[in-house]
Curated annotation (Swiss-Prot):
GO terms for cellular component: phosphopyruvate hydratase complex. InterPro entries: Enolase, Enolase-like_C_sf, Enolase-like_N, Enolase_C, Enolase_CS, Enolase_N. The lineage of its organism: Eukaryota, Viridiplantae, Streptophyta, Embryophyta, Tracheophyta. This is Enolase 1. Pathway: Carbohydrate degradation; glycolysis; pyruvate from D-glyceraldehyde 3-phosphate: step 4/5. Coiled coil: none annotated. HAMAP family: Enolase. The gene is ENO1. It comes from Zea mays (Maize). The active site is at residues 216, 354. Mg(2+) binds at residues 251, 302, 329.
Length: 446
């Protein structure tokens, strides 16, 4: 007798920012059950699939009871009796038939909500692994047709700016990547040591309150110059003794400070009495990145331009794309249609993989396979509003993304993912391979 889904239960829980989010349990005919919880972002791309919120006054409009109801009353009853190992079939059924809404970029989940569909998709994926009696990462690898498992390089977001922090810093994330480590375990050691060295440098320079942490566990010192963030990282890496072994990554989240009207980028956008004197063109911003890259060991720049500024993206990718990966997040929103366009137009050369931007495991896998076949890098990612769910840790190994960013080594909802990766590496034993310097292309495309 094949094991089937016998019940589905959704509930409203809370993310790491105290905002409601969706959690789903999927029960099986053998008496077991699996659980999935979805995250949510602060700086969201306008092309992301719909995250259904209730509106009204409860929870300041951020309740998810409609999404919960959609799972309990529409999706749940419709998937009872199905085989949880049939991920593609269940995802496509939810996305294309039960929801069925689409726009020019594909299935947009406007009816049921990407948060409702994804919570079920995650729980079904975990249930499928349980039924097959294999680890979740192996089940994901099998679904994708990936034969080689690789542990990702962690990209620790240790200095926060942009929409994640109350300082004046325009650029959102300054990250460290221990590419010179020989294992994930060693990468954690390097990351943690740089983080603690950074903390003492910031405390000494800016005072105790500058070491308060942001949504993702990074520090948010009150600095204005983006270059100062890079200087701090360089100093911390040096102090920890890892120069040459730990490189730098940035997530600029430039859509947050792009002016639609005059098509300029305002690096002073968080200043109260902003007179607009710091507005620059896309080309000037591109040159600023090139100067950063020549001065600092930067190997990854995410969302360097606005989500609709395809042409400036392509220029930067053409000019420095060999040396540095140019990652599309708001640009691509993990959407296979947008990924195809970017591959075609050589807009960027890496995908930021956020399952909740597209809303199903199957579509996420499709976006990753397309990216890898185009020779792109892939970085699996958390959201700023996270839960204790560790799905993306298994996802990054199962798809051999080569990279994962899930915050600083601080705050339990961030460490939950890193700790799961430590367990996976331990479980793989001698078969464990760490991406290291090959983080942009850790495996042959599958």
């Amino acid at each position: 007798m094949a094991v089937t889904i016998t019940w589905v239960k959704a509930r409203q829980i809370f993310d790491s920012r105290g905002n409601p989010t969706v959690e789903v349990d999927v029960g099986l005919s053998d008496g077991s059950y699996a659980r999935g919880a979805v995250p949510s972002g602060a700086s969201t791309g306008i092309y992301e699939a719909l995250e259904l919120r209730d509106g009204g006054s409860d929870y300041l409009g951020k309740g998810v009871l409609k999404a919960v109801s959609n799972v309990n009353n529409i999706i749940g009853p419709a998937i009872v009796g199905k085989d949880p190992t049939e991920q593609v079939e269940i995802d496509n059924f939810m996305v294309q038939q039960l929801d069925g809404t689409s726009n020019e970029w594909g299935w947009c989940k406007q009816k049921l909500g990407a948060n409702a569909i994804l919570a079920v998709s995650l729980a079904v994926c975990k249930a499928g692994a349980m039924v097959k009696k294999i680890p979740l990462y192996q089940h994901i690898a099998n679904l994708a047709g990936n034969k080689t498992l690789v542990l990702p390089v962690p990209a620790f977001n240790v200095i926060n700016g942009g929409s994640h922090a109350g300082n004046k810093l325009a650029m959102q994330e300054f990250m460290i990547l221990p590419t010179g480590a020989s294992s994930f375990k060693e990468a954690m050691k390097m990351g943690v040591e740089v983080y603690h060295n950074l903390k003492s440098i910031i405390k000494k320079k800016y005072g105790q309150d500058a070491t308060n942490v942001g949504d993702e566990g990074g520090f948010a010192p009150n600095i204005q110059e983006n270059k100062e963030g890079l200087e701090l990282l360089k100093a911390a890496i040096e102090k920890a003794g890892y120069t040459g072994k730990v490189v730098i990554g940035m997530d600029v989240a430039a859509s947050e400070f792009f002016g639609e009207k005059d098509k300029t980028y305002d690096l002073n956008f968080k200043e109260e009495n902003n007179d607009g004197s710091n507005k620059i063109s896309g080309d000037s911003l591109k040159d600023l990145y090139k100067s950063f890259v020549s001065e600092y060991p930067i190997e990854s720049i995410e969302d360097p331009f606005d989500q609709d500024d395809w042409s400036t993206y392509a220029k930067l990718t053409d000019e420095i794309g060999q040396k540095v990966q140019i990652v599309g997040d708001d640009l691509l929103v993990t959407n296979p249609t947008r990924v195809a366009k970017a591959i075609n137009e050589k807009t960027c050369n890496a995908l930021l993989l956020k399952v909740n931007q597209i809303g199903s495991v199957t579509e996420s896998i499709e976006a990753v396979r397309m990216s890898k076949r185009a020779g792109w890098g892939v970085m699996a990612s958390h959201r700023s509003g996270e839960t204790e769910d560790t799905f993306i840790a298994d996802l990054s190994v199962g798809l051999s993304t080569g990279q994962i960013k899930t915050g600083a080594p601080c705050r339990s909802e961030r460490l939950a993912k890193y700790n799961q990766l430590l367990r996976i590496e331990e479980e793989l034993g001698d078969a464990a391979v760490y991406a290291g310097a090959k983080f942009r292309a850790p495996v042959e495309p599958y």
